[in-house]
Amino acid sequence: MTGETQLRARRTRIKILKAIAGLNRSAGFSEIRDATGLSTGSIYYHLERMNKYVTKDLRQYRITDEGLRLLSEIGVKSVVSN
């Protein structure tokens, strides 16, 4: 992966994390798609690689404590103060 591709992937994954965190730390796939504007394929691709930050429980994706820590570290405090 090139540096530019890695940066784009990170930005996409942060966008997904922010969307889930902003939806009370739990969201269905359609909610993630609507909140991010990303394609179905892109969301699935990234969610598969984010198991440290997002878990799937039945039909909901939930942000993990590690995902909340990451958002806090990058300065996204408004969505993680639950």
Predicted regions and their residues:
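Hydrophobic structural patches
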Residues: 17-20, 47
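Conserved segment of winged-helix/HTH DNA-binding domains
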Residues: 67-82
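Short helix-capping/hinge SLiMs at alpha-helix to coil transitions
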Residues: 20-24, 57
